[in-house]
């Protein structure tokens, strides 16, 4: 499997989540020192992660805005330390070009933008400048849709075209339907049922639903975030069967066997 100029063995891969934030919904405050972050990265790599997604600002509903300066202070030391110690691809989870540039200079390989270039109009130019793969996620301000799957597909197609127009090569563009972002439980569920339509847009698809509220709802409600890893793994299997190629998860080990087996059947 290729992500731009990068090659990953197999037809599917796990992206391990590393939140260096104090307020992420699942593991906020757990990895706020470089050493704690490195220890977690080492475990995720041992468990089978092929990409580490580093985030310095929580994007959960109601989260506090973080300036680019503070975000850079959080992520750059961690990215540098990971690159110094491990041979692993790193994505930077940010929608700010200033942070993204600093992360790329520090050694990050991939951009992961939860606003698909809408928040910062220079993100696509930056991706083109660095020949960096970019993940474009569906997002919007309100949970209002004519038909959620079609609207998500239209959005992703339009944003991918905007990236192409800005000089990003097609093989550097990945898409993410944005589960948990501006979508009700019902809308998330509807999108899950029609995930194959997203996978037919002509771009590789990242699946990110790990521990989110819709997983809790599918389990009947009242579960804690870390109690959702088994269901997350089941949904990873479902997504890979629908055509997704990367699953973004908190618990790498719980997903590794599924990805290893299904990767050989894709």
From Swiss-Prot:
Residues covered by the Pterin-binding domain: 12-260
Pathway(s) annotated for this protein in UniProt: Cofactor biosynthesis; tetrahydrofolate biosynthesis; 7,8-dihydrofolate from 2-amino-4-hydroxy-6-hydroxymethyl-7,8-dihydropteridine diphosphate and 4-aminobenzoate: step 1/2
Record GO terms (molecular function): dihydropteroate synthase activity; metal ion binding
Keyword Magnesium: yes
Cofactor: Mg(2+)
Key words, A-Z: Folate biosynthesis, Magnesium, Metal-binding, Transferase
GO cellular component assignments: cytosol
Name of the molecule in the record: Dihydropteroate synthase
Annotated function: Catalyzes the condensation of para-aminobenzoate (pABA) with 6-hydroxymethyl-7,8-dihydropterin diphosphate (DHPt-PP) to form 7,8-dihydropteroate (H2Pte), the immediate precursor of folate derivatives.
Quaternary state and interactors: Homodimer or homotrimer.
InterPro entries tied to this protein: DHP_synth-like, DHP_synth_dom, Dihydropteroate_synth-like_sf, Pterin-binding_dom
Domain of life of the organism encoding this protein: Bacteria
Source organism of this protein record: Streptococcus pyogenes serotype M3 (strain ATCC BAA-595 / MGAS315)
Designated gene of the protein: folP
Enzyme category, top tier: transferase
């Amino acid at each position: 499997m290729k992500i731009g100029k990068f090659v990953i063995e197999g037809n599917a891969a796990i992206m391990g989540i590393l939140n260096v934030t104090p307020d992420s919904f699942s593991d906020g405050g757990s990895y706020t020192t470089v050493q704690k972050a490195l220890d977690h990265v080492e475990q995720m790599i041992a468990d089978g992660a092929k990409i580490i997604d580093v985030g310095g600002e929580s994007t959960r509903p109601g989260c506090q805005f973080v300036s680019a300066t503070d975000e850079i202070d959080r992520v750059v030391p961690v990215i540098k330390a990971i690159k110094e110690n491990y041979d692993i691809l790193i994505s930077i989870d940010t929608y700010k070009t200033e942070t993204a540039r600093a992360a790329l200079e520090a050694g990050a390989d991939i951009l992961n933008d939860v606003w698909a270039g809408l928040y910062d109009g220079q993100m696509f130019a930056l991706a083109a400048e660095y020949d960096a793969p970019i993940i474009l996620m569906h997002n919007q301000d309100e949970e209002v849709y004519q038909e959620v799957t079609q609207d998500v597909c239209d959005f992703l197609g339009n944003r991918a075209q905007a990236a192409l127009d800005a000089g990003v090569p097609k093989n550097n563009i990945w898409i993410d339907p944005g589960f948990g972002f501006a979508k009700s439980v019902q809308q998330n569920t509807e999108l899950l049922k029609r995930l194959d339509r997203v996978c037919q847009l002509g771009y590789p698809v990242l699946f990110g639903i790990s521990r989110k509220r819709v997983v809790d709802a599918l389990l009947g409600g009242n579960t804690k975030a870390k109690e959702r890893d088994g269901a997350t793994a089941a949904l990873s299997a479902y997504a890979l069967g629908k055509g997704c190629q990367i699953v973004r998860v908190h618990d790498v080990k719980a997903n590794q066997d599924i990805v290893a087996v299904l990767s050989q059947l894709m």
